[in-house]
Amino acid sequence: MDNVMAQLESLEVRYEEIQEMMADPEVIADTKRYMEITKEEADMREVVQKFRKFKADKEEIAGNKEIIADGSDPELVEMAKMENSELEDEISQLEDEIKILMLPKDPNDDKDIIMEIRGAAGGDEASLFAGDLLRMYEKYAENQGWNVSIVDSEQTEVGGYKRVAIMITGNKVYSKLKYENGAHRVQRIPVTESAGRVHTSTATVAVMPEYEQVDIDLDPKEIRVDVYRSSGAGGQHINKTSSAVRMTHLPTGIVVAMQDQRSQQQNRAKAMEILKSRVYDYYESQNRDKYDAKRKNAVGTGDRSERIRTYNYPQNRVTDHRIGLTLNKLDRIMNGELDEVIDALTVYYQTKQLEELAENA
């Protein structure tokens, strides 16, 4: 904790400097600079507050130890001992919380994401489960106050999805959903199963951070643009004008569809932004083989034996195999109540990170 303490002292000094800067009229007048400063202050606030509480508790313990050493008032001594016991527990908890807050930040944690869900092993049932996962993530996003838009999809005849790509925007989206990468296995009786037998199917989920201000030039000749009528929410505007836009990047086959904006021009702009992000991700991997390997590494092959999580409908049970977490709350989880699962995954991986740092210290 000693090396962490030195970092915390420096952090507190910087925090006080930032608070002074936030009251400086020159900084306030510079909108960009002021936004940078307020973000830095917000990022530091929690750890500085906990560090100050940690120091205050330490001082209080020292004061109580003086009372105990004096020993002239037995009643005060007993109270000081009880208080120190509680403070020691609080300090221990604060140490753990501070260590986690001081862990190196994932540079992508604040970013929005593109999530791709594909029906894998299991035919029609896998495609239906892909649709169920889509709705689960949509409801979770709604609970978080995030926005979701479908950017590409291929539905099946039974109403499921062979594949669907969505963009989720909001506060710290990637930090919450980055652990959803992988094969998700479902065990249930398909609606098409007359004998009532439980089947096992899978769908894969890939989560990719959305790149901001991607510096890539796309040749307009290599982009096919299709316009069509919007469907879904939108009131009387629906199906009266061709405002929805689908863009296909011909060299890579990457497709983006956008219909959530109010006009074709807005949909074109948003679709191009997302297309650039996805093409950039593709070319960052050098070639399609590396791109496919990257995606496969994220989601696996989708084989039934591969899974990060199992959704067992007959037993109303969800098991995350990476951390051995089992919850008999499948109905609630499929309704978007993912917090308990995501929080447990976050704690698990933060703990692993702390252990690795301790080993290398």
Curated annotation (Swiss-Prot):
Its main location: cytoplasm. This is Peptide chain release factor 1. Methylated by PrmC. Methylation increases the termination efficiency of RF1. It holds the Pfam family PCRF. One of its GO terms (molecular function) is translation release factor activity, codon specific. The modification N5-methylglutamine is found at Q236. Peptide chain release factor 1 directs the termination of translation in response to the peptide chain termination codons UAG and UAA. It comes from Lactobacillus delbrueckii subsp. bulgaricus (strain ATCC BAA-365 / Lb-18). Keywords: Cytoplasm, Methylation, Protein biosynthesis. Belongs to the prokaryotic/mitochondrial release factor family. It is found in: Cytoplasm. InterPro entries: PCRF, Pep_chain_release_fac_I, Pep_chain_release_fac_I_sf, Prokaryotic/Mito_RF, RF-1. GO terms for cellular component: cytoplasm.
